From Swiss-Prot:
Pfam families: ATP-synt_ab, ATP-synt_ab_N, ATP-synt_VA_C. This is ATP synthase subunit beta. Keywords: ATP synthesis, ATP-binding, CF(1), Hydrogen ion transport, Ion transport, Membrane, Nucleotide-binding, Thylakoid, Translocase, Transport. It is a peripheral membrane protein. Its EC number is 7.1.2.2.
Length: 486
């Protein structure tokens, strides 16, 4: 699965130097491989164990030598070993056969489920779609999750930054989005694990199986393909695994003409790996030690994530902010490409409000009247101003109590608490934990529901009726039930 074979006889070279994950290979005159070609080394180490290693050509050094970056460990590699030019970039399997499977950067399955049953492969390096092929009209991507659709709507073919610490519900939110795109949009998802913990990758896989996102009995019914280059792998693998996942997503968009969700966890690790490789190749570092090609590297990945006339790739990227410094070149470069940000707040998770999306910190470029319409825009802004006022009043309530507020402020607090509760909803993928059936809420139902709360039409209903429900009809039914129980 490493590369498509070239038509001429493959050129063979000899390893002349190995420094960590970087190796220099000498080829015969006139037989030098191209930049980004995959080199394959298959040999035995001094202990008699098999070595099978792929490296990507990064530099042509002169004197018939090339410098390549290994995609796996270089343990046991010695000078004099033979390296073969595959004549093509690293290529990975694509199509339906990838669903439910876990791959490494080279497109090799690592889930012990046997070989991948497909002959379709695609190179991980390709150009972004031409301007004439792009869908330029902004279109909202409905997720069925109230808080996202109302306050920070996603753009179809856009890029979303997902911010949140440990244990606030990132994984569950990702699972729900994968589930909803499959059921409501007939789309599939690709998950790229870039430089994160192997344990987290394994946990995610097990949770996907538990929630039905991966069907272990019939993999063809699965809704996601996974591609991992984890923290313990060499920088070459971490730098390229995002492109491997993106290539799988592009096939679903361009060939199957589907809407695809691409998850990248974590986009910062992609930049970090590029920085390591850049230093190993001897390039002069730029600001804060990052690679001088930072903008180019990030742009090459991000520009391929887009809507075309055939389909779309909507990307949700977890963003780690080093030392919480938003001016660090890595997150700052990433922000330039994002259309929306979804911020998960620990305070909301502590209150039991799931999804714990912060309604005041989350933003979207789509939230403007010309895109979402006047009604949606006005409703969203009214919800945010009500919640903002409630936030301002919380200190007064804590010191003096609710009774000291004016009648108008008491009403604002009451409605804000209902809004906060109504922003929660039960998830399909969490049914096994909550015992409540999941809800997909249409955008028009979401807008209508919040308008009714803001207009005071539901002031007489108890606050608890708004918690973990779908639309307003369910609120009313729950209120009746609470009334009967009393």
């Amino acid at each position: 699965m490493v590369a498509t074979p070239s038509t001429s006889a493959p050129a063979k070279g000899v390893v002349r130097q190995v420094i960590g994950p970087v190796l220099d290979v000498e080829f015969p005159a006139g037989k030098l491989p191209k930049i980004l070609n995959a080199l394959r080394i298959e040999a035995k180490n001094p202990a008699g164990q098999d070595i099978a290693l792929t490296a990507e050509v990064q530099q042509l050094l002169g004197d018939h030598r090339v410098r390549a970056v290994a995609m796996s460990g270089t343990d046991g590699l010695v000078r004099g070993m033979e390296a073969t030019d595959t004549g093509a970039p690293i290529s990975v399997p694509v199509g339906e056969a990838t669903l439910g499977r876990i791959f490494n950067v080279l497109g090799e399955p690592v889930d012990e489920q046997g070989p991948v049953n497909t002959s379709d492969i695609a190179p991980i390096h390709r150009s972004a779609p031409k301007l004439t092929d792009l869908e330029t009209k902004p279109k909202v991507f409905e997720t069925g999750i109230k808080v996202i659709d109302l306050l920070a709507p996603y753009r179809q073919g856009g890029k979303v930054g997902l911010f949140g610490g440990a244990g606030v519900g990132k994984t569950v939110l990702i699972q729900e989005l994968i589930n909803n795109i499959a059921k409501e949009h007939g789309g599939v998802s690709v998950f790229g694990g870039v430089g994160e913990r192997t344990r987290e990758g394994n946990d995610l896989y097990e949770e996907f199986k538990e929630s039905g996102v991966i069907n272990a009995d019939d993999l063809s019914q699965s809704k996601v393909a996974l591609c991992f280059g984890q923290m313990n792998e060499p920088p070459g693998a971490r730098m390229r695994v995002g492109l491997s996942a993106l290539t799988m997503a592009e096939h679903f968009r361009d060939v199957n003409k589907q809407d695809v969700l691409l998850f990248v966890d974590n986009i910062f690790r992609f930049v970090q790996a590029g920085s390591e490789v850049s230093a190993l190749l001897g390039r002069m570092p730029s600001a804060v030690g990052y690679q001088p090609t930072l903008g180019t590297d990030v742009g090459a990945l991000q520009e391929r994530i887009t809507s075309t006339l055939e389909g779309s790739i909507t990307s949700i990227q977890a963003v780690y902010v080093p030392a919480d410094d938003l001016t660090d070149p890595a997150p700052a470069t990433t922000f330039a490409h994002l259309d929306a940000t979804t911020v998960l707040a620990r305070g909301l998770a502590a209150k039991g409000i799931y999804p714990a999306v912060d309604p005041l910190d989350s933003t979207s470029t789509m939230l403007q009247p010309s895109v979402v319409g006047d009604e949606h825009y006005k409703t969203a802004r009214a919800v945010q101003s009500t919640l903002q006022r409630y936030k301002e009043l919380q200190d007064i309530i804590a010191i003096l109590g609710l009774d000291e507020l004016s009648e108008e402020d008491r009403l604002t607090v009451s409605r804000a608490r209902k809004i906060e509760k109504f922003l929660s909803q039960p998830f399909f993928v969490a049914e096994i934990f909550t015992g409540m059936s999941g809800k997909y809420v249409k955008l028009e139902d979401t807008i209508a529901g919040f308008n009714m709360i803001l207009a005071g039409e539901l002031d007489d209903l108890p606050e608890q009726a708004f918690y973990l429900v779908g639309n307003i009809d369910e609120v009313k039914a729950k209120a009746e039930k609470i009334k009967e129980e009393k």
